[in-house]
Amino acid sequence: MLYTAVWAHRGASAYAPENTMAAFLLARRLGADAVELDVHLTADGEVVVCHDNDIKRCSNGEGLIEDKTLEELLSYDFGYSALFGERFKGE
């Protein structure tokens, strides 16, 4: 019997900000078998999830991930967006 796996691209990114825990958990609740995501290394060698190598599009910050420490990245909000407003603030 054939089985078709459902992959959630950046989580349930149509319903929650991409690559956030909210998007990943919602994808699972919606029945996704797996999540596709991208990872990058920070300036201090930590692994973070983000599609772009620049954080401007998906956060309230600017700059390249590779130039920022994890502590710096944690100071930005990756949950707010014009699409979702305040609903996922702080993700």
Model-derived features: positions:
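N-terminal amphipathic alpha-helix/helix-capping segment at the start of soluble metabolic enzymes
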Residues: 1-11
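Metal-dependent phosphodiesterase/phospholipase catalytic core, i.e.
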Residues: 4, 51-91
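Conserved, mostly hydrophobic/aromatic
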Residues: 9, 27, 38, 73
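Short, glycine/acidic-enriched loop or turn micro-motifs at the edges of active sites
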Residues: 12, 39-41, 54-55
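Conserved beta-strand positions in the central sheet of alpha/beta enzyme cores
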Residues: 7, 35-36, 49
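Short, acidic/polar
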Residues: 16-26
